[in-house]
Amino acid sequence: MPWFEAHDTMARHPKTLKLARLLNQDRRWAVGLLHDLFSWGLYAAGKDGELKGLTAADVAQALDYPPKKAQVVVGALVAAGYLDETSDGYTIHDWYDYAGKLYDSREKNREKNQRYRDRKRAKECQ
């Protein structure tokens, strides 16, 4: 099961408090939004956190935010420092810090499975 690190400081981190303030919500709500963002990111983002080709409306939809408020929620995530705007969409800021162990684990498993397949194939050819 995929996972990401949820640090104990997230709930009261200045970035989280800023996000809550910008969206006129309490910090617990902001933490929930961030958990949605990060859990969705496990499937939607690349290893570097890149949400390539996705618009603000796409991000808002993934977070179950009303389409007419897409710019508000994504703008707040950018202003708070959780998303970075790129020329081709968005990047989840410091994504590798949150999900890096998952990507490393997936890579090790791929390599291990490939070695197993190679050994099996070599035995079959003997």
What are these language model-derived features?
Residues 1-91, 96-99, 103-104:
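Positively charged, structured surface patches that bind polyanionic biopolymers
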Residues 101-125:
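Basic DNA-binding region of bZIP-type proteins
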